[in-house]
A protein has these predicted regions:
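Structured-RNA-binding interfaces characteristic of tRNA pseudouridine synthases
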Residues: 1-198
Length: 198
């Protein structure tokens, strides 16, 4: 998501086409829309959804190697789901960030989705905002829960500790995608509901 201010009116469809013609093949602008003058792509957002994709096969699918984290281990999805419930809500996520500067570390996780299909996991994280490396550390922590290194019941203690050393490893960046930014409460509520109904 991005925002810009233009002095002259534009044809949105033409602008979209021209913009995409200038971008590399792996980046696409999907929509162009006029907004109010005070709109800001980051500050006007009420929530974001990140997805993290993990390949659990012994040998990773060759076409997924750039876009998924290869983690060839059996995982206990029920334990991961239990741990995710402890993470949902408003918490100080100091234990789950590599942030070095003093900054407000309280965030709200509205929903965590865990979907297993065809030897792959898709984790969906919907929150009001995320700290530096937060989704990667949360993902690594859930994988540590899934392999038995961390018990689901330890998550509240890890949150209380406010100590990065207590949480799991940071999953690599290559499985992480910003999948959606929400600008209305209705959109956000619908996405949260979809995850909870899975």
């Amino acid at each position: 998501e991005c925002s810009l201010y233009l002095e002259n009116a534009i044809d949105e469809a033409m602008f979209l086409q021209q913009l995409n013609s200038l971008l590399p093949e792996d980046i696409r602008v999907l929509r162009v829309a006029k907004e109010k003058r005070d709109f800001h792509a980051r500050k006007s957002a009420v929530g974001k959804c990140y997805e993290y994709r993990i390949d659990l096969r012994d040998k990773m699918e060759v076409f997924h190697r750039k876009y998924r984290f290869h983690f060839p281990n059996p995982v206990n999805i029920r334990a991961m789901e239990k741990a995710a419930k402890y993470l949902t809500g408003t918490h100080d996520f100091s234990s789950f960030t590599d942030l070095k500067e003093d900054k407000d570390t309280v965030r709200t996780l509205f929903a965590v989705g865990i979907v297993y299909e065809e030897d792959a996991l898709k984790l969906s994280w919907i929150g009001d905002g995320f700290l530096y490396h937060m989704v990667r550390v949360l993902t690594g922590t859930l994988l540590d829960v899934g392999t038995g290194k961390i018990k689901p019941e330890e998550i509240p203690e890890i949150l209380k500790a406010k100590d990065r050393k207590k949480s799991g490893f940071p999953a690599p960046a290559k499985g992480l995608f910003l999948s959606r930014v929400f600008y209305t409460e209705e959109e956000l509520d619908e996405a949260v509901r979809e995850i909870r109904e899975r």
